[in-house]
Curated annotation (Swiss-Prot):
NCBIfam families: himA, PRK00285.1. One of its GO terms (cellular component) is cytosol. Gene3D superfamilies: IHF-like DNA-binding proteins (4.10.520.10). Pfam families: Bac_DNA_binding (PF00216). One of its GO terms (molecular function) is DNA binding. This is Integration host factor subunit alpha. One of its GO terms (biological process) is DNA recombination.
Amino acid sequence: MSDSTLTRMDLAEAVFREVGLSRHESAQLVESVLGHISDALVRGEQVKISSFGTFSVRDKNERIGRNPKTGEEVPITPRRVLSFRPSHLMKDRVAAGNRRKG
């Protein structure tokens, strides 16, 4: 497992190298795509990316939790959480450790 992290800048650089847009246009493209994904999730829509996975927002109800140190019961407020469900192809690819060709 790697300690490295893929950043927005890394994505923009990959678009620059692989697509041939300028660095500025590549960065704008990445920001635009991420913005559209974020906006859809804020509206409560699912975002399905073929062969990758599905992002969705789930509403979690209020429930009773427990403080592990004291054992005291505490209410956990209702909230919205972001969920990602990888596609079967992505699961298989990660399990096999296969990198993308190209």
